[in-house]
Amino acid sequence: RELKGATGVVAMSSGMAAISNTLFCLSATGKNIVSSRHLFGNTYALIGGTMLRFGVKPKLVDLTNLEEVEAAVDNNTACIFMEIITNPQMEVADIAALADIAHSKNIPLVADTTMIPFTHFDAHALGVDIEVVSSTKYISGGATSIGGLVIDYGMPNFTKRMRQEMLMNFGAYM
């Protein structure tokens, strides 16, 4: 599908490279990331462990409970991160409502769309600002080749920072 509204796309070496580089690009020491407590295991370890060691606090909430999400977002929140369908619990949150909360606080909604083919799902139409996806299944299907994509829907300087800072410093080139 045409990526309507995309202002930039960065190809990464894996889906986890796409997620980790995106979250590190958006956050800094003293910031927090509001996310679901139900995540793909590696993503959970990244947000709840690795990023915590860099001073980025995880706020793991029930994304289907909008009041809980709203209460978790504060002045130090870097973004709301979600999986379109959580893996492995298969929960689905209200994407447009989460986008409304994020935008009311001037922070991006970042969505991992790996569980729904990004070629058939328009996350941007529901308010997603940055889409991350494991493109492995589209490249080879059997993990003989892996990849990830970061799709930017207009975050100021985000694609530029991803290319000039994150790729150069973290080496997730594809």
Predicted regions and their residues:
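Conserved PLP-enzyme active-site core in the AAT-like
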Residues: 8-174
